[in-house]
Amino acid sequence: MENEKENLFCEPHKRGLMKTPLKESTTANIVLAEIQPDFGPLTTPTKPKEGSQGEPWTPTANLKMLISAVSPEIRNRDQKRGLFDNRSGLPEAKDCIHEHLSGDEFEKSQPSRKEKSLGLLCHKFLARYPNYPNPAVNNDICLDEVAEELNVERRRIYDIVNVLESLHMVSRLAKNRYTWHGRHNLNKTLGTLKSIGEENKYAEQIMMIKKKEYEQEFDFIKSYSIEDHIIKSNTGPNGHPDMCFVELPGVEFRAASVNSRKDKSLRVMSQKFVMLFLVSTPQIVSLEVAAKILIGEDHVEDLDKSKFKTKIRRLYDIANVLSSLDLIKKVHVTEERGRKPAFKWTGPEISPNTSGSSPVIHFTPSDLEVRRSSKENCAKNLFSTRGKPNFTRHPSLIKLVKSIESDRRKINSAPSSPIKTNKAESSQNSAPFPSKMAQLAAICKMQLEEQSSESRQKVKVQLARSGPCKPVAPLDPPVNAEMELTAPSLIQPLGMVPLIPSPLSSAVPLILPQAPSGPSYAIYLQPTQAHQSVTPPQGLSPTVCTTHSSKATGSKDSTDATTEKAANDTSKASASTRPGSLLPAPERQGAKSRTREPAGERGSKRASMLEDSGSKKKFKEDLKGLENVSATLFPSGYLIPLTQCSSLGAESILSGKENSSALSPNHRIYSSPIAGVIPVTSSELTAVNFPSFHVTPLKLMVSPTSVAAVPVGNSPALASSHPVPIQNPSSAIVNFTLQHLGLISPNVQLSASPGSGIVPVSPRIESVNVAPENAGTQQGRATNYDSPVPGQSQPNGQSVAVTGAQQPVPVTPKGSQLVAESFFRTPGGPTKPTSSSCMDFEGANKTSLGTLFVPQRKLEVSTEDVH
């Protein structure tokens, strides 16, 4: 048997040849009779049963089984084949024909869409059963059998049965089995539904909806009518009357789950739809009004279009079944806005049920809401059902009304538009702060003015707290000799100029020697607050007072120790290797510009030369010229870089003077006596063959009215070490910067040429005290300031004490002021001891009360040699 089965499965063609005698039909009948002597008349052989047992094992059978499981049509066809196998073989032959037909032919053979419509299907269903059946006869209905007979899906039969169940024409016995009642209880059921409809005030709802539609067409803003409370009092959370299926006495369904089935909504909707016809005065109900009442107007707004269309489709299904029962018929209502689909009641006239047997009406009990879960209540009560009653409408409304409503909505919402409000707020907020790109110059000017005003207020506070400067007797400059010093390099590189702050806000411009690659720097201060002068006590000669600032202490105290030095220029070769000089201050008309030209020799040569008697006389004349002159102190302020000049020995062009004196190549540093110490190293000077670095102190006298006309010094670079000249800055840029910073007045013009200073406007000159600045520690000597402050260690191991002098008391300058220059030289020489110098009070009685007295610290020069 196993071998036969293998042959049967593996070689079906051999099996066919063995069992099919038609292959020998070409031979004579005699031969056929010999081969098959016992066979009757020739017929088509039927499919053996063994093949059906072996089908699931073949790929074709498996594919057919999968297709039948997936496709409902094939599954239904297989079921029909199994049902009608015993009756006749015609359905099987018909199915075989459909299998061999193509797709288009198969669709043509199927019933059309009209034939499958619910109305036609309902007519066929009702034709199977009588309107008034005999109760003694079994009137059970099997839905599966009906679906097979009508050749439709079972779900289509369910739609018909649900509507008939709502009218109590059928009752449910079990799953897929119903009992047919016919029209025996139809009038009674309709009377019950009419009474319930009157209790729910469906007539008022229909009138209210029609009235609201009429008002919305002509007046959009008008709200709901006064009858809204009628609906709200009778509506549930779904927006329409919430009630269960209406049952009649004696016709209660025997199924326990009758009111909990999923298809309950269709039955309830069908009963409500019939109620609308029964309670309306003209028994014509449009589909739009029925949808608003049955589905709920708010649900029409909340639901999306797909769900709403599904609900409308359910209403059409109910209407088709009722039309098949000859209860309603489809008509069209013509109104102002066009033609609408509607249905007219054609059934029997029903009066409200007044019989003694009251119908069993199952409304939603109050305890049903209690049993409802809190989550469901929260989901239903989260949003109000009638929040926006006038905005969204049914899609079937006319476009004209929608356009009018949209226009009115735009007009009403225009004044309170959030976009316009934001723009207004942004414009108000941005009013005090305009665009920076459009108002950049004005903003910069405002910021500069605010900074200058703040600095002026700080200066006033500091001036109020400052005390008088203690006078110290000036040093008597030696007559016979001046020392020449060679300065070693300090820690700070050349060009790094730390600005030591000062209580005052005005300053004399300062130019420091720079490296060949870097520009010079000029320090400018606001001239508006430079009118501060002090009067020294009578009997003391005018000197220079330096002030130590607290901000300059700390990490830079060790580098702030400098020495005052002066020497005569004795060698032209050494002079050519030293940096250029600064421009002196502008002088008054009739006064001469006197300059002293210190000079030094290269190497470690230390020699002192006697000063001639003429220089001593000139110095005494300078001291006499200081009488009746009040000086003004200028601290350091702004550090402004200036390019270096490309030539040595530049001449100073003084404003208002034709004669100008030639300056030595040595650097002369202008500084304020209140500005403290500004150290400058000479390491870079040594790299460019600077044997020594000499500083000559100057005393400048400038009139108070022309404080803004402060001199600008030119610091020429060495042509030998820096062959490529650097261009000077534009004078327009310098003037613009200083004017906007408030450092100079608008009528003052600065010149950035190598040999010129500024052009003073006012002819009056104010006296300016310029303190000598020290460029570095001397080679072999250190200058110590006498002070009670303990000395701080220097990088070279020497102890240097820093003295902080008090600020002078400001007074008003008196009388006319003269221009004079005073030169203070470091006392002592290479052979003198450390404490050889003392204070000299000679010529003190020659100083008048109007002269500014600025005492100078006592200096001690050590004789230690540093190799």
From Swiss-Prot:
Compartment(s) where it occurs, according to its Swiss-Prot or TrEMBL record: Nucleus
Region spans: Disordered: 38-58, 408-432, 532-616, 771-800
Keyword terms, alphabetized: Activator, Cell cycle, DNA-binding, Nucleus, Phosphoprotein, Repressor, Transcription, Transcription regulation
Transmembrane spans: none
One Gene Ontology cellular component annotation held by this UniProt entry: nucleolus
Record-linked Gene3D superfamilies: Winged helix-like DNA-binding domain superfamily/Winged helix DNA-binding domain
Annotation: DNA-binding region: 113-182, 261-347
Triggers of expression: Following DNA damage. Up-regulation in response to DNA damage is not confirmed by PubMed:22802528.
Main location: nucleus
Segments of skewed composition (Polar residues): 413-432, 532-556, 568-579, 775-800
Keyword Cell cycle on entry: yes
Biased composition range(s): Basic and acidic residues: 557-567, 594-604
Top-level taxon of the source organism: Eukaryota
Domain commentary: In contrast to classical members of the E2F transcription factor, atypical members contain 2 DNA-binding domains and regulate transcription in a DP-independent manner. Both DNA-binding domains are required for DNA-binding and are proposed to form an intramolecular structure that is similar to the winged helix structure of the E2F-DP heterodimer.
Protein name: Transcription factor E2F8
Lineage, highest ranks first: Eukaryota, Metazoa, Chordata, Craniata, Vertebrata
